[in-house]
């Protein structure tokens, strides 16, 4: 029998980036906020100090940084004809757990989506005609202009380093000329580039492309954010993605918000408690709070006026399904919306090997790189190409972590002494150019509940049905050719191309950019949440995270996730609290 | 009778009963209570009189002295366990003479040799402020002192030798700011309690005033700011910034000084912090004797440990990242003739005090599990002899002794 706890104004399910942002915003409004996190308290000096942060074996290979999938995981299959099996070990993506969420182990590549990305359906239909059969791309219901101040806010919170390419409509030399307008320059200058980025800049210039520094949440200099939190200059150690930063040099909830938030008397954090379900009243149209369980198995009813789901794209979608809010999507009938439009990211790359030049990839950082954006979104004419969307192409030097990094030229055996020699010969003399491709929604890529497998509490696991689509393959093929052109001009001895080949394989690491499932949109017939991320069905439930993306753009998602969270927080503060109820009339 | 009327009748009765108390409350005007609140901040009362995780001012916190553990009492106005039955005269006597209401002597862990410099009105204001706090019932644990230290009578002798009661007398030769600073440093601020070396009986060595001391396995650095002093290279502005925000270009506060900043100096008026700076900058010292430089093998070993473990934050040339990671070059703690704090920080790590100005509790990790006594000694010796620093080398035995002293005692 669940014990009933005293009510709070707001309960946050999950305490990563979006949970911390919402907690900070709503406690500022004077609300009593409780965050419930299934994982542990984590902080820099106690959990990832410099003395243990760069432990590749522990954090990445033994997966200590991520969600424990012996308690809960996903099942996976490529298509509806297959039987999904549980992912017993993370591979293609790495779901976080604990305070700070996946935002502890991100690289820090902090992009804004293009203005046209938010109107991907109407924009592309206008320009190229109807979408192909099976493609379920749609507009976000919110525009770039509306989100601009919120992108700006997040960039200042994090101390993003970069160079503006479009300052209030004026194109700036050295920045990304394709980006949406910015109301201000980045708060910090770009990172220091290395030999590889210089080669990339030279090669792209030769092709008439405009290279610019990747926007980075690794600090290019000491920074104090608007809350007074201090971040230290990055040391370029190359332990960002898959690791916590020991040097206070990477923006995360821990380094940018928690020092201030944790001191507030109207904020409470409860760790090691998992929310089992959002509880609804008899009408099913109002949430009464959540039911959660601690590690000893004791269950609690936590009443709250407002429930905000901040449990990562996959966790949030599953919680909506388990709570019975909205109808679960069924691809056979096209009915239902929860779980629809699951998208990912379509990556491909080329490696460049030098004969006598040292790239020294161990001097790295998660967002140390140069990029070009000519082939992203609708920055180029897609007429006759057979796909929509695109991706940025970049040369990042994120790391040369010794267990993970072993680039070898074409034709090298995959093991044995010849392999070892090739690794040793090329370790300091290679780099890579990658395409970060968008992922367009299709009717057959979706999430639902698995009919067979359950988690440690007996709840059905979520089932992922996903494969690369015809649009993905055509787009990635095009981008990979552009990658090849650039790589070939970077002055190396040889290159090796790694095109994206289907079917999608859930094991090799690609990116932790899972999107869709509780998509946002203009009305309740096409979306789970409205433009303020408010549930159409239960208006005192809001859902944060990339699960609200109707499809994924050719960028890393964190910037857009945070901007949408700030946009939602503002709507709650200025509209919802005055008059609790639907913020958009259906 | 309707319910609201009934309630107001009851309220009227309550007011009548409470009338004598109301009269007292009127005397304690807002201004008086605020004066007391500020005076409490200047004396950092909260720091010692609050046990971790317990209600503020309810006492119970142990102060480790060379003679044993002395517990701070409850100073809320709870009648049984706190000051609830004390008169203003009782409180004055405690602060001015170091004696309890029954005439018994306090241990000078309670810094009455400093508080005696506070004028009566200031002490009364503290009393009035403490009277406004929520009373908390909390017994003080027994002090853990061996014979004869547990005989309070012995304190009469101590007082006779080291204690002279008397309110601060301004020096007419000096500026108003200097006098205010001297009052704050020597009176309520009781800086010498940590920053002055003690004699064998625990009294301050007058000749060593504010030249650094040792307490509870920490060495507190020399804070004299005049020529030859430990912070001679700090400007007045830098002293003010440090006391206000917990950081300045040279260093960041942690450990005991973190508490002082958290509960005391960050709450003080900038004029007062400037007065402290004016006073400290006027304290000259004799030049320090240059220390011996470690041998080359130690410097080589120390440099290797430093580059692998320390340089990412403290930077290859010891310049650190001001206000984020402490510079080691020119650091008062690093150059302290007493290396206790340097060794201890390497072993245990340190946490910069989060303040209103700088809320991030930036921390250095512990290296005790990673570095041997020899490695700690080598790297400590290296930083104490590099980049303009010139303090004596550290031996592995010193490291081992401190490591042993810091082991948690098994109860």
Show where each model-derived region lies:
Chain B
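Sequence context of c-type cytochrome heme-c attachment sites
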Residues: 34-37, 42, 50, 54-82, ...
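Axial heme c-ligation environment in periplasmic c-type cytochrome domains
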Residues: 69-85, 90, 96-121, 139-144, ...
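C-type cytochrome heme c attachment motif
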Residues: 38-50, 73, 90-97, 108, ...
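Bacterial N-terminal signal peptides
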Residues: 8-20
């Amino acid at each position: 029998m669940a014990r009933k706890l005293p009510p709070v104004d707001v309960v946050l399910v999950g305490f990563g980036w979006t949970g911390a942002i919402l907690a900070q915003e709503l406690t500022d409004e004077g609300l009593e906020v409780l965050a419930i996190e299934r994982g542990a308290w984590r902080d820099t000096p106690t959990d990832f100090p410099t003395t243990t942060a760069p432990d590749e074996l522990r954090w990445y290979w033994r997966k200590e940084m991520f969600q424990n999938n012996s308690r809960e995981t996903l099942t996976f299959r490529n298509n509806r004809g297959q039987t999904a099996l549980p992912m017993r070990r993370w591979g293609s993506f790495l779901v976080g757990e604990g305070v700070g969420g996946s935002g502890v182990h991100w690289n820090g590549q902090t992009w804004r989506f293009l203005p046209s990305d938010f109107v991907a359906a109407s924009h592309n239909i206008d320009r190229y005609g109807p979408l192909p059969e099976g493609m379920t791309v749609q507009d976000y219901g919110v525009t770039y202009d509306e989100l601009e101040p919120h992108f700006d806010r997040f960039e200042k919170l994090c101390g993003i380093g970069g160079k503006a390419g479009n300052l209030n409509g004026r194109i700036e030399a050295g920045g990304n000329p394709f980006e949406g307008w910015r109301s201000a320059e980045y708060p910090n200058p770009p990172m220091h580039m290395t030999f590889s980025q210089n080669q990339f800049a030279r090669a792209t210039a030769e092709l008439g492309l405009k290279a610019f520094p990747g926007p980075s949440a690794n600090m290019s200099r000491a920074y104090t954010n608007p809350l007074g939190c201090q971040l230290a200059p990055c040391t370029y150690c190359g332990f960002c993605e898959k690791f916590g930063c020991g040097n206070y040099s990477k923006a995360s909830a821990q380094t940018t918000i928690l020092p201030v938030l944790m001191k507030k008397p109207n904020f409470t954090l409860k760790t090691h408690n998992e929310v089992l379900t959002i509880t609804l009243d008899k009408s099913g149209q109002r949430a009464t709070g959540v039911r959660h369980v601690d590690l000893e198995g004791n269950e609690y009813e936590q009443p709250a006026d407002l429930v905000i789901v901040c449990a990562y794209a996959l966790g949030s979608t599953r919680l909506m399904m388990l709570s019975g809010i909205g109808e679960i999507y069924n691809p056979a009938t096209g009915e239902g919306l929860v779980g629809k439009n699951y998208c990912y990211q379509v990556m491909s790359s080329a490696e460049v090997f030098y004969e006598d030049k040292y790239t020294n990839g161990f001097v790295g950082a998660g967002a140390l790189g140069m990029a070009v954006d000519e082939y992203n979104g609708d920055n180029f004419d897609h007429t006759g190409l057979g796909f929509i969307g695109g991706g940025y192409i970049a040369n990042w030097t994120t790391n040369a972590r010794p267990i993970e990094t072993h680039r070898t030229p074409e034709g090298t055996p995959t093991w044995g002494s010849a392999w070892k020699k090739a690794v040793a010969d090329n370790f300091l003399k290679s780099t890579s150019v990658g395409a970060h491709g968008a992922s367009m929604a299709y009717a057959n890529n979706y999430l639902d509940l698995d009919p067979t497998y359950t988690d440690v509490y007996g709840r059905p696991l979520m089932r992922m049905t996903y494969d690369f689509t015809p649009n993905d393959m055509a787009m990635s093929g095009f981008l990979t050719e552009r990658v090849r052109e650039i790589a070939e001009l970077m002055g190396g001895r040889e290159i090796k191309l790694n095109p994206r080949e289907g079917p999608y394989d859930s094991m090799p690491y690609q990116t932790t950019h899972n999107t869709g499932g509780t998509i946002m949109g203009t009305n309740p017939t096409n979306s789970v949440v409205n433009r303020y991320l408010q549930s159409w069905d239960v208006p005192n439930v809001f859902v944060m995270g990339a699960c609200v993306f109707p499809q994924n753009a050719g960028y890393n998602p964190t910037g857009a996730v945070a901007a949408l969270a700030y946009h939602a927080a503002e709507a709650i503060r200025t509209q919802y609290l005055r008059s609790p109820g639907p913020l958009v009339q259906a | 009778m309707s319910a609201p009327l009934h309630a107001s009748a009851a309220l009227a009765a309550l007011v009548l009963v409470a009338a004598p108390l109301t009269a007292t409350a009127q005397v304690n005007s807002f201004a008086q209570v605020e004066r007391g609140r500020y005076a409490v901040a200047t004396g950092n009362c909260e720091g010692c009189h609050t046990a971790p995780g317990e209600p503020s001012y309810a006492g119970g916190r142990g102060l480790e002295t060379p003679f044993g553990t002395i517990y701070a009492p409850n100073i809320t106005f709870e009648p049984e366990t706190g000051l609830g039955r004390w008169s203003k005269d009782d409180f004055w006597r405690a602060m001015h003479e170091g004696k309890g209401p029954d005439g018994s002597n306090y241990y000078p862990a309670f810094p009455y040799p400093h508080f005696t410099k506070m004028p009566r009105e200031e002490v009364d204001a503290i009393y009035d402020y403490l009277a406004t706090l929520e009373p908390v019932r909390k017994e003080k644990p027994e002090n853990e002192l061996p014979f004869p230290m547990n005989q309070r009578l012995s304190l009469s002798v101590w007082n006779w030798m080291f204690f002279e009661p008397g309110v601060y007398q301004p020096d007419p030769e000096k500026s108003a700011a200097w006098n205010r600073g001297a009052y704050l440093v020597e009176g309520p601020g009781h800086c010498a309690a940590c920053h002055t070396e003690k004699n064998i009986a625990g009294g301050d060595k007058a000749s060593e005033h504010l030249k650094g001391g040792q307490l509870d396995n920490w060495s507190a650095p020399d804070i004299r700011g005049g020529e030859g002093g430990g912070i001679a290279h700090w400007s007045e502005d830098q002293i003010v910034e440090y006391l206000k925000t917990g950081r300045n270009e040279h260093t960041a506060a942690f450990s005991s000084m973190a508490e002082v900043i958290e509960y005391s100096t960050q709450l003080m008026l900038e004029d007062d912090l400037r007065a402290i700076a004016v006073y400290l900058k006027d304290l000259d010292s004799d030049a320090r004797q240059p220390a011996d430089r470690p041998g080359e093998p130690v410097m080589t070993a120390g440099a290797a440990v430093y580059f692998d473990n320390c340089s990412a934050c403290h930077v290859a040339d010891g310049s650190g990242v001001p206000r984020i990671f402490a510079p080691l070059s020119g650091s008062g703690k690093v150059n302290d003739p007493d290396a206790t704090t340097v060794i201890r920080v390497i072993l245990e790590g340190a946490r910069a005090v989060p303040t209103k100005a700088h809320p991030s509790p930036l921390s250095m990790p512990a290296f005790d599990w990673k570095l041997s006594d020899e490695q700690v000694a080598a790297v400590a010796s290296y930083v104490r002899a590099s980049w303009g620093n010139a303090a004596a080398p550290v031996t592995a035995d010193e490291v081992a002794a401190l490591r042993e002293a810091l082991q948690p005692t098994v109860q």
